[in-house]
Amino acid sequence: MVAAAMALVVPATAQKVNDAAILAKLNKSDVEAADAKKSAKASVWVNRAKVYTDALMEPTKSLSTSLDATFLNYTMGTPSETSTDDKGRQLLIYPWVKVYVENNRVAAWDQTKVIKDGLFEVIVEAAAKAIELDEKTVAKVKPILDTAINYYSQLGEVSTYIPNFEVAIDAFVKAATLQQSKIYTQVDPKYYFFAGQMAAFLGADNKQYFVDGEKYLDKARELNYSDETGNLYYYLFHCYYGQREDDKQNLIKAKETLLEG
């Protein structure tokens, strides 16, 4: 049935991202947000959160993990280039994104272009402003934030797979930050745990990541993150131990963390 349905669909010739039209919407929203009269309306900020989230999603909206790669011919068109990486994964290069394929399934992707910088910051600001002006907008704002959170959560997962831990950390922290909105009762601690885990991996080459990892893992612990194998304490130990030369107390904390876990 799927094959028959696909046979009726004409493959796209290339990935189409109408960035000009999207930028026009963003620019219109910028003008409205800067207008004293219009910016006093909650609806302006709801729309602002929406159009900026749409811009965030657009380049990768046709992608999901485990998607049959054959469908990409119909949703994204013919890649401009194909190759194989050092792990034997097929790479499909599109104008806006590089797709990793394994066993004819989409395994991950790396977005190589953005429609506009600073989308995340505007989404956070617009959502908060809409609710500040009218709490009744929560019903409209929540689906928008849910979409953005899902985007960053998925970005974190596929970036971990590639692996591109720097991007993964940033994505997981942004997902957690979006959940700090008053719309949600609590941030899902897994986002801080995953960010801390990735930071612990990177700490050997850049000690700042040990510092960041400690911060993220502490937040996960404060939010009652738990797992049966005690991985939080394992990675927190490495973050403390990696900072042992900066402060002797970190060595003590490292030992205490092992005992606690």
Regions from the PLM with identified roles:
Residues 44-47, 142-143, 153-154, 186-194, ...:
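Alpha-solenoid helical repeat scaffolds
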Residues 130, 175, 220, 260-261:
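Canonical positions in the second alpha-helix
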